[in-house]
Curated annotation (Swiss-Prot):
Heterotrimer of A, B and C subunits. Allows the formation of correctly charged Gln-tRNA(Gln) through the transamidation of misacylated Glu-tRNA(Gln) in organisms which lack glutaminyl-tRNA synthetase. The reaction takes place in the presence of glutamine and ATP through an activated gamma-phospho-Glu-tRNA(Gln). The lineage of its organism: Bacteria, Pseudomonadati, Pseudomonadota, Betaproteobacteria, Burkholderiales. This is Glutamyl-tRNA(Gln) amidotransferase subunit A. It is an enzyme of class 6 (ligase). GO terms for biological process: translation. Its EC number is 6.3.5.7. It catalyses: L-glutamyl-tRNA(Gln) + L-glutamine + ATP + H2O = L-glutaminyl-tRNA(Gln) + L-glutamate + ADP + phosphate + H(+). Gene3D superfamilies: Amidase signature (AS) domain.
């Protein structure tokens, strides 16, 4: 059952091969058996089965939508009524939200059944899921490796077939990079496509929610439910609703050849994504994927994104600056961790934050406070915003000669747990290919396209596909065509 896609699972429900309750019980057993992966921070079988019973009733009454009865897990950055919502932090270890995030509410309204809340880097700050207050997550493909971050619990859960779908968030690559490391499909929509209401904020001008699943087709189904205008989110974009599945399985150009479904598609290859720093085994997997696209009729076009290397310093000025503001609300007064002993109000603030936040969060708060301080705001924050605009302009120049841009999602496969913990800069460099997409607010996704070599032969490689603004449906079409021609996305870790 766990090897089926969302569409196949829904067909099984419609054919009464199983009920939503039986499906939920199946996945709950798998989650319990895979506790060593540490992919979950909160599972509540009673809550899950109550939702499954409601889904069965809707299915029986003929009132169910296309996602009714299908299980999903939520990254623990989305507040969820009835469940703890921790953001991977001791600061919120026992926080119970009185409301659902818009993403959670929309998926619940579509009839999906929540299996649990997944582990993550604290406040979404990390690239390996080692920064969680609840311990690191293990990669199901190789349990000595990280699953990527910050949505590492979600990527591990989908990869290990503990859930057919998951939500994640992407601030600088936190859907695409863990999707790459865990061999699953994940999409970061255009900034503003998916509501941030109820998503615990890290960097408000960058944070964006999105789905993770086995395939592009499954992600398209999920995005249909997740996307849309939300008046409660000031950054939500008011656009007509779309069917993100509408191009799947169709030729790129009208009247196209079935043998060459992507004839007419121009794929931009940035020289900056294939230079020094890209591991040979990752390059080999990406090159093989590009050959598949050529066989499907696409044309490869050289493009340039000259400010790519500046995306790291720009991101690590802007994101910490916004984080220092967003996280100032966690002071032990209204909610969150409060120190047990303190002399006065100021001492309570200091001790509560010192005890509640982990090392990486403290590091970024300090950096953010510094770059926003008097005398440094112009030199750092404003300059970073200017370069951010230039990075976005570089993408628009590239899209004049191509329809999508492709390259690696990460310069390497997943590294060993603990390998980069003492060197935050090396950890930051792992996001070199994803940060600029986030800074520009563009949609991007990662699809499985192979594995590493030698000692890394069990560690997946992800192909990053970048689209222009609001072009998710076409981007998903391009990913789906690749997955119809290959089987990387249906391969499973040993023992699954």
């Amino acid at each position: 059952m766990h090897a089926k896609s969302l569409t196949e699972l829904r067909a099984a429900l419609d054919a009464k091969e199983c009920s939503a309750v039986e499906l939920a019980q199946h996945y709950l057993k798998r989650i319990d058996a895979a506790r060593d992966l540490n992919a979950f921070v909160h599972v509540d079988a009673e809550l899950t089965l109550a939702q499954a019973k409601a889904a069965d009733a809707a299915l029986a009454n003929g009132e169910a939508g296309p996602l009714a009865g299908l299980p999903i897990v939520h990254k623990d950055v989305f507040v969820t009524r009835g469940w703890r919502s921790t953001a991977g932090s001791k600061m919120l270890a026992n926080y119970a939200s009185p409301f659902d995030a818009t993403v959670v509410a929309r998926l619940s309204a579509a009839g999906m059944v929540t299996l649990g809340k997944t582990n993550m880097d604290e406040f979404a700050m990390g690239s390996s899921n080692e920064n969680s207050a609840f311990g690191p997550v293990k990669n199901p493909w190789d349990t000595s490796a990280v699953p990527g971050g910050s949505s590492g619990g979600s990527s591990a859960a989908v990869a290990a077939r503990l859930a057919p779908a998951a939500t994640g968030t992407d601030t600088g690559g936190s859907i695409r990079q863990p999707a790459s490391f865990a061999g699953v499909t994940g999409i970061k929509p255009t900034y503003g496509r998916v509501s941030r209401y109820g998503m615990i904020a890290f960097a408000s001008s960058l944070d964006q929610g999105g789905p993770m699943a086995r395939s592009a087709a499954d992600c398209a189904l999920l995005l249909n439910a997740m996307a849309g205008f939300d008046e409660r989110d000031s950054t939500s974009l008011e656009r007509a609703d779309e069917d993100y599945t509408r191009h799947l399985g169709k030729a790129w150009a009208a009247g196209g050849d079935a043998g060459k479904p992507l004839a007419g598609l121009r794929i931009g290859l940035p020289a900056e994504y294939f230079g020094a720093g890209l591991a040979d085994d990752v390059r080999a997997a990406i090159d093989a994927a590009l050959k598949t696209y050529e066989a499907l009729g696409a044309t490869l076009v050289p493009v340039s994104l000259p400010k790519t290397e500046l995306s790291i310093p720009v991101y690590y000025v802007i994101a910490p600056a916004e984080a220092s503001s967003n996280l100032s609300r966690f002071d032990g007064v209204r909610y969150g961790h409060r120190a047990a002993e303190y002399r006065d109000l100021l001492d309570m603030y200091k001790k509560s934050r010192a005890e509640g936040f982990g090392p990486e969060v403290k590091r970024r708060i300090l950096v953010g406070t510094y770059v926003l301080s008097h005398g440094y705001y112009d030199a750092y924050y404003l300059q970073a915003q200017k370069i951010r605009r230039i990075i976005a302009q570089d993408f628009q120049e590239a899209f004049k000669s191509c329809d999508v841009i492709m390259g690696p999602a990460s310069p390497t496969v997943a590294w060993d747990i603990g390998a980069k913990g003492d060197d935050p800069v090396q950890m930051y460099l792992a996001d070199i290919y994803t940060l600029s997409v986030s800074l520009a607010g563009l949609p991007g996704m990662s699809v499985p396209c192979g594995f590493g070599a030698g000692a890394n032969a069990k560690r997946p490689v992800g192909l990053q596909i970048i689209g222009n603004y609001f072009d998710e449906a076409r981007m998903l079409q391009v990913a789906d065509a690749f997955q119809r021609a290959t089987d990387w996305h249906v391969q499973e870790p040993a023992g699954v």
